[in-house]
Amino acid sequence: LGHTPEIPSRNRTILAGLIRDLSNPYATRFELRACNPYTNTYLVLAAIYSACLDGVKACATHTTAECLAEISKDAGEEGFYLEKDRAYRSEDDVFEDYTEEERTRLFGAPPATVWENMQNFENYPAKLAVITAGGALRDQIIEAFRAGALTRWKTELIARIIPENRDIVRAAKEAKTDFVTDLDSYNWNKINGIRSYLAKDSIDEKSLFTLLINALNEGDYATASGLQVEMYDKVEELKSLYDSYVKNMI
């Protein structure tokens, strides 16, 4: 929004920004930065305009000063329209000037997976009612969008993401050297344990990759979502440990 009405901001780390040029009022625009490459332009515009109209209706009986105070309120402060426990405005870099815990507390936790994102249609019925109120987004359209997003998520995981992570696991090999310390042995045992947990099946126990693929194929998306988050964490841990392991080799 800007530091003051006279000092515009070009903070582009936020979800939606008001971009202004004091020398050209007609250049004022809103900038939404949450869309991904798969976003359907027509659907997102329908949702945006429906949400804007809901906000316009709520603000129609309030002064501009009251509306500014509403969007500038602190988390925990009661407002006439916006959620009590959320903050909506920042002139700071939200990635550099806030910790992850602060971002979550003030602005909400972003969904970690596509499944978590799609669950928001069920978790927030009041917000769903807002974007469907005008009739542009019918239940059939939303359900078709949801089904398409989940199919693409499943396909991406099985056909691309899991194979790429499997390659990372296979590339983490034990170093062949005559000079090995106890630290090297300790690190390799941890690394190999993670490798096996991620990618190696046994008769009695399935690897995380196999469990994730099975959950996706069985349509158990809640389980698959949790396993995807765990997979990312384990792969990052593996890469970090292997980097330290390799650097200690001489």
Task: Annotate each PLM feature.
Residues 1-250:
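C-terminal accessory/tail domains of diverse enzymes
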